[in-house]
Amino acid sequence: MYNLTSRQEQVLQLIKQYTEETGYPPTRAEIARILGFKSANAAEEHIKALARKGAIEIMPGASRGIRLTESQSGIPIVGRVAAGNPILAQEHIEDYCNIPNSFFSPSADYFLRVHGMSMKDAGILDGDLLAVHRTDQVRNGQIVVARIGEEVTVKRFKRQGNQAQVELWPENPDFKVIHVDMRDQEFSIEGLSVGVIRRD
């Protein structure tokens, strides 16, 4: 949408998250400290670049003089995730939904547009927006966003003890259980389902 570099995207996501959690944007010094920049000047350069690209507006003379543009407010809606790419890569973000992330518990970091009917019996249908809390800490029986190799899927997580095998269960008898052996397959949990929105 804004053709951001990975570092600019990182700064933008920090500004959004910080603003959502505290009600006001971070200072340059806070951005530098959180992201490990050597100085506030480094943060300032990224902020200026974001403003040039239209992702934020700068209000001169204020230490917290950063405002997200209208299209940046709300929770990002992620469409199809290209193989191997981070879920919140800028090219995956279709839009933003103006619902406070605190509407969900735990809070939602993004919406993932659902493709397919493998989770229909859990009330998650094709085209729905799945509210996702970013975490890799999940419990048996929870609905998760998982990455297997380069593909992302939404399934119910099941694991016996500390075994290397994981099962990802669909909520539709027409689909098969996915068996993952973490000893020879790349596997990670990208987030936890915390709600679903259906748009007419």
UniProtKB/Swiss-Prot annotation:
It holds the Pfam family LexA_DNA_bind. Keywords: Autocatalytic cleavage, DNA damage, DNA repair, DNA replication, DNA-binding, Hydrolase, Repressor, SOS response, Transcription, Transcription regulation. It comes from the Bacteria. The active site is at S118, K155. Residues 28-48 bind DNA. Gene3D superfamilies: Umud Fragment, subunit A, Winged helix-like DNA-binding domain superfamily/Winged helix DNA-binding domain. GO terms for molecular function: DNA binding; serine-type endopeptidase activity. Its EC number is 3.4.21.88. InterPro entries: LexA, LexA-like, LexA/Signal_pep-like_sf, LexA_DNA-bd_dom, LexA_repressor, Peptidase_S24_LexA, Peptidase_S24_S26A/B/C, WH-like_DNA-bd_sf. SUPFAM superfamilies: LexA/Signal peptidase (SSF51306), Winged helix' DNA-binding domain (SSF46785). This is LexA repressor.
